[in-house]
């Protein structure tokens, strides 16, 4: 892989446009897996995605220049899959399976273009929406977030000279390497990069991936970023996301269909994928409700990804459920990925060691941790909690409840309706930092 002097690159402002998103596969692998399912099973569904900044104190429209934002969004719309990328997607094995992407899907994908966007300002925030066919709008989620986050980072760094930038990145590299050295203490660790959506920059994410590859080669299982996986000869990792049950629930016309929605999309998923891709994300409408009503066959899936409950608490509930269902947790997999940093990874690993198979998806605190690295504090380098969520499907509002009420999305009246239907037990407020 080409080595880049990141500090020098950041300081060099001579490019007419320095693209943030360099490829359509500069995205999370699970977006492609979900895209194939949407293309195959839900081709006529429309879905609207919207940017949601949960860190209200950061007024993005007052930080990021609108002209620069439009230029980056417009550039992303010019991207098409290259011949090299098509060959790699068609010929590579993923999760031990050859040709996971159907030839007809890849033919369609070869002509794919990101759809148009709507951008405006309201109360110091950007209103960024993507309307259209679900199989098109879904692909905006990751590039939109990457663009917003990197433009914010670039704005924060504009006033710094080359020497200060050099010190900043030297300290950030040292800080990252200290984390890697601590992870070496865990003998059977399995960890992957989940940091694309809220990364400091593409180049920094690439450096962090290289650091994991170099520092913990036996523990590092791959990256969710498809472009980096291809370029670095790594495994592309990822399963599925909340948008699947959110859309299925939005489309439900009866209470019976609403109750079955979280399991319907799992059946759909199982039609296309298997093995280690059979990982349940249970918290879209609350993990307690999901487990209480889950069919027997869900217990036969490979594992769960507890996403919004504290990792130890969430993991224990799933282990208890497996035992209740007569399954041996030692043969099952838990993937932890919610706002993790080294302390939480180590504590969670030690708590569950020997009781269950574990994997860790390391996100924002891997690819966007510059706290204490600048000579003077730069608030613009602190990560924010920003998401791009589906808010509507076929004109019907979409909702996410989560195990953490602070992560809930949707119209208040619809959120209340879902809470009455699914229940609110075991939902606990805790601060959302990333």
Swiss-Prot record:
Q: Which reaction does it catalyse?
A: nicotinate + 5-phospho-alpha-D-ribose 1-diphosphate + ATP + H2O = nicotinate beta-D-ribonucleotide + ADP + phosphate + diphosphate
Any keyword Phosphoprotein?
Answer: yes
Q: Which GO terms describe its cellular component?
A: cytosol
Task: Provide the alphabetized UniProt keywords.
Answer: Ligase, Phosphoprotein, Pyridine nucleotide biosynthesis
Q: What class of enzyme is it?
A: ligase
SUPFAM superfamilies cross-referenced by the UniProt entry: Nicotinate/Quinolinate PRTase C-terminal domain-like, Nicotinate/Quinolinate PRTase N-terminal domain-like
Post-translationally, this protein is described as follows, namely: Transiently phosphorylated on a His residue during the reaction cycle. Phosphorylation strongly increases the affinity for substrates and increases the rate of nicotinate D-ribonucleotide production. Dephosphorylation regenerates the low-affinity form of the enzyme, leading to product release.
- Positions carrying Phosphohistidine: 242
Recorded metabolic or biological pathway in which this protein acts = Cofactor biosynthesis; NAD(+) biosynthesis; nicotinate D-ribonucleotide from nicotinate: step 1/1
In UniProt terms, what function does this protein have? Answer: Catalyzes the synthesis of beta-nicotinate D-ribonucleotide from nicotinate and 5-phospho-D-ribose 1-phosphate at the expense of ATP.
What protein does this entry describe? Nicotinate phosphoribosyltransferase
Please report the organism this UniProt entry assigns to the protein: Rhizobium rhizogenes (strain K84 / ATCC BAA-868) (Agrobacterium radiobacter)
């Amino acid at each position: 892989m080409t080595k880049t002097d990141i500090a020098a690159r950041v300081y060099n402002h001579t490019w007419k446009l320095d693209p943030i998103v360099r490829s359509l596969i500069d995205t999370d692998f699970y977006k492609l897996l979900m895209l194939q399912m949407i293309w195959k099973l839900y081709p006529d569904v429309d879905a609207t995605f919207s940017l949601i900044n949960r860190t209200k104190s950061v007024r993005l429209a007052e930080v990021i220049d609108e002209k620069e934002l439009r230029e980056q969004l417009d550039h992303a719309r010019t991207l098409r899959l290259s011949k090299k990328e098509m060959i790699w997607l068609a010929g590579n094995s993923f999760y031990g399976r050859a040709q996971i992407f159907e030839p007809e899907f890849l033919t369609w994908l070869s002509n794919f273009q990101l759809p148009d966007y709507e951008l405006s300002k309201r109360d110091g925030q950007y209103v960024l929406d993507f309307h259209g066919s679900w199989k098109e709008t879904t692909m905006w989620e990751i590039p939109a977030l990457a663009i917003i986050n990197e433009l914010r980072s670039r704005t924060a760094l504009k006033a710094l000279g080359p020497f200060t930038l050099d010190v900043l990145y030297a300290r950030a590299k040292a800080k990252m390497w200290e984390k890697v050295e601590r992870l070496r203490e865990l003998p059977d660790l399995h960890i992957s990069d989940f940091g694309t959506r809220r990364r400091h920059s593409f180049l920094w994410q690439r450096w962090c991936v290289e650091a994991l590859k170099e520092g913990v080669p036996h523990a590092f299982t791959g990256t969710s970023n498809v472009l980096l996986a291809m370029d670095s000869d790594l495994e592309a990792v990822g399963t599925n996301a909340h948008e699947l049950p959110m859309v299925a629930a939005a489309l439900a016309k009866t209470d019976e269909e609403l109750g079955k929605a979280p399991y319907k999309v799992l059946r759909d998923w199982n039609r296309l994928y298997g093995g280690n891709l059979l990982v349940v994300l249970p918290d879209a409408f609350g993990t307690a409700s999901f487990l209480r009503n889950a069919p027997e066959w869900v217990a036969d899936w490979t594992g769960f990804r507890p996403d919004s409950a504290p990792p130890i608490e969430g993991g224990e509930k799933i282990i208890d459920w497996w035992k209740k269902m007569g399954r041996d947790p030692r043969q099952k997999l838990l993937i932890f990925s919610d706002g993790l940093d080294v302390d939480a990874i180590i504590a969670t690993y030690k708590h569950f060691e020997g009781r269950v198979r574990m994997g860790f998806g390391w996100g924002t605190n891997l690819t966007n941790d510059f706290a204490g690295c600048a000579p003077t504090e730069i608030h613009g380098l602190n990560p924010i909690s920003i998401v791009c969520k589906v808010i509507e499907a076929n004109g019907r509002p979409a909702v996410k409840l989560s195990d953490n009420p602070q992560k809930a999305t949707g119209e208040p009246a619809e959120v209340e309706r879902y809470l009455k239907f699914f229940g609110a037990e075991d939902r606990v407020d805790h601060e959302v930092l990333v």
